[in-house]
UniProtKB/Swiss-Prot annotation:
Subunit and interaction comment: Part of the ribosomal stalk of the 50S ribosomal subunit. The N-terminus interacts with L11 and the large rRNA to form the base of the stalk. The C-terminus forms an elongated spine to which L12 dimers bind in a sequential fashion forming a multimeric L10(L12)X complex.
GO cellular component terms attached to this protein's record: large ribosomal subunit
Protein family per UniProt: Belongs to the universal ribosomal protein uL10 family.
UniProt protein name: Large ribosomal subunit protein uL10
UniProt GO BP: translation
Matching HAMAP family: Ribosomal_uL10
Length: 179
């Protein structure tokens, strides 16, 4: 039976695994407290956080939330980078920090209940931000509509030119400009 403190930690980790849009498991061995603090600050700007977790408690939390797929990643010192916002921004920031520090390493992650390898997390980080993807989708939807408007207005425009030419023939230039 876990102590009340461990039970609270299990519940907190369970909540993270249940609600986070992305959870990245990292090995933080050798990372200084100052570096961790700076990394946490940068993550908080992106609605993300960094938390050192115990593997046994995380394993229990994963079993309770149906995310047991992460248990193979729970070896050695583990810290969770989790995002409640844009998962791409959190992945980019984590990989950028890992490259800069040369100490933090990505073990893998969890996205929508699916296990991500370290390579998958890197691939996720190369995606454009959510807003840019949405803009591309909207642009893709608008382009056919503009084409349809062009096609439908073509015959009307042609009729207008024919009528203006006829008015010029019948009444002269002044009548055509007035029309």
């Amino acid at each position: 039976m876990p102590t009340p403190e461990k039970a609270r930690q299990i519940e907190e980790i369970s909540e993270i695994l249940r609600t986070a849009s992305l959870a990245i498991l990292t090995d933080y061995r050798g990372l200084s407290v100052a570096d961790m603090t700076a990394f946490r600050r940068r993550l908080q700007e992106q609605q993300a956080n960094f938390r050192v977790v115990k593997n046994t408690l995380t394993r229990i939390a994963a079993e309770r939330t149906g995310t047991e797929v992460i248990t193979p990643l729970l070896e050695g010192p583990t810290a969770l980078v989790y995002s409640m916002g844009d998962p791409v921004a959190a992945a980019k920031l984590t990989l950028e920090f890992a490259r800069q520090s040369r100490i933090l390493s990505v073990k893998g992650g969890l996205l929508a209940g699916r296990l991500l390898s370290a390579a998958d997390v890197e691939a996720l980080a190369t995606l454009p931000p959510r807003e840019e993807l949405l803009a591309k989708v909207v642009g893709g939807l608008q382009a056919p509509l503009y084409g349809l408007v062009s096609v439908l207005s073509g015959p009307i425009r042609g009729l207008l030119y024919v009528l203006q030419a006829r008015v010029r023939q019948l009444g002269g230039e002044e009548a055509a400009e007035a029309a």
